[in-house]
Amino acid sequence: VERDEAGRLIREIKPLEGIRKTIAERMTFSKHEYPQGTGQVLLNVDKVMQFRKELLEKKGIKVSFGDLYVKAAACAVEENMALNASRQKEKLIYYDDINLSVMATINGFLMEPVVEHADQKDIEEISAELKKTYENLRKGKLMKVKLEGGTFAVSNLGSALIDSQQPFISPPEGAIMGISRNRRVPVFDENDNVVPANMTSFALTIDHGLCDGTEVVNFFASLNKILQDPWKYMYHKRGQAEEA
């Protein structure tokens, strides 16, 4: 029987090593070296749910809400490229590639697989890529997964009983979007009638050494616009002409 200095009974002692040590070091560095600010917003996702249902019914394609929000993030970042950046020493680096680091807990560890050029992929491509990525991570095939090179991060806790979150940025990325669970709640419509709506809380944490609150406001405005018209944005690819 072993107790600590305060007399508490110790069940087990493990060394801080491997992936757990790497995560601890990265998050400690993030907290102490980057002045962070977080904004939160509650957005209506009824249209997203309808789009997901129609995609399954009409094309037989099942995508997760996480997939949809990753694509939405790519579109929102495309409209707010000041967030697609990194602060490294005395330099502010702005990227043209939009590579999304998607936080995921795999086999008990926090991983950050990267969806490269997410702005140039539609929802079907992103969903298929993430499914394959998660499968490789669960099987321990790390060499087949891109785990670095992200320019913007996404943390999805939508499947957990979490109403809101305040994610830490994951350097060198200068911003991270957090997604919490969907809740069906009563809201007022344009005629002041109480109606049910699916609402989801989104957060955006930024490096204040890189950008300011204005970018957070603009990002949420873009995100809301995208979520209200998923039929347009889920198949949007940067650099390609939109269909009439």
Where are each of the predicted segments found?
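C-terminal catalytic/motor cores of large multi-domain enzyme assemblies
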Residues: 1-244
